[in-house]
């Protein structure tokens, strides 16, 4: 056998040994797990960093190895939940460099976005950019959850099939990119989360234009010349940014079923009285802020997180406005 052939043979043997080690490690861990819990199963293996992930009854654990196959870290956990504010299709905050905590997360851990997700925006169908972004989020170790804001394409968002997830209704954009619908309560590791997306667009001084209006082009040109902000119906604005009576009533029913008590409330905008604290008369009250005021006055909760106003601020001990920060809540 010449030197080159010997080198190739040695590399092949190394690869086979590495694979045998992986198989042995996996079988050993599974055998140990089965002795403790017959229902444990491996649901993810990330070979690059030598991590095995397991789940059991919606609980999760991971075991991390060094290159010699020895255990260097073991974690058994309830789900971890982080929360952040408006993204507007800019998901750079979820890069590994900006959000290093994700290194130790799994699909049983969650990041919640408080509206203006922006991942479902293109007019008629998913664009190449959207597909790339949604696939990228779906590839993350964690699961992305979001309530809707006022900057979503509701024609497309509401066209996704309605599914049940953790006790509430959702739209699944990807298997681990999930829209939390309005008026729902989700149970995650014993924590109850009430969600209610939507808000009024307050940056439309020029009004809403109708594409089929005979004077559409003329009106648009005038508004552009005067730099007045406007929206175009079913292109950049949808009436569903504000809730329907049915959505509000469903929220009331679900809260009543939980004795009007939840751990967390996640919305896009906030209650009328809270909005006054934030901007005085800058923001107008509407059907949703008044509905959320009703919730605020009648529901027992620990923390309320919301976005929309593009700031990071503890309004009071219970209500937290969040924008670009990512904070852990569980």
Language model segments and positions:
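Active-site-proximal loop/helix segment associated with metal-binding centers of metalloenzymes
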Residues: 191-282
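Intrinsically disordered, glycine-rich low-complexity segments
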Residues: 8-20, 25
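Binuclear metal-dependent phosphoesterase catalytic core
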Residues: 62, 75-77, 283, 290-298, ...
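Active-site-proximal beta-strand elements of phosphoester/diester hydrolases
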Residues: 78-88, 190-199, 266-268, 321-324
